[in-house]
Amino acid sequence: ACVQIFRFNNFTTSDDYQNDYGLSTTHWVTTFAKDVKPRTHPYQVVCPLPLNIPKYLKRYSYTNIRALRANLGTTKFIPVEYFEELLTLIPNPSTGISLLFWIWKETGSLDHDRVKGFTFFDKSQKHHYFDEHKACMHKGDLEKALYLKMINGDTTEILQP
């Protein structure tokens, strides 16, 4: 079986973190935010925001346009219809839940044992593994509820918001 490992934005795969999540990476997940450092390794680049659609590029004004343009031809973007469906469920989805929703829509399932590193913005957890507790604009409770429905295969309320 092919193992796909998605890492977000300014991830690190240093030996310090090897026991937590290993060193491999197959996909770089980025929204091309201004504070995201460019990568030179030839990862498959995926963007869980539809930044290839002008109205969404305008909505996410923090986008580094130069980096986006440099990667436009090689980046796979979330299909806009998936993102718009997600917006009916979660008004301001994180890139993490956007990616998981995208995978779920494409495959029809989501395996909890293969998803690592999501805290759903639990206030007792760090926002990211590398920083301090931060205020968050995302709705962790809604994201967690959607995640649980996806891993449990419960599509009744997901498909009928």
Where are these regions (language model features)?
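Metal-ion/cofactor- or nucleotide/acyl-coenzyme-handling active-site neighborhoods
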Residues: 1-161
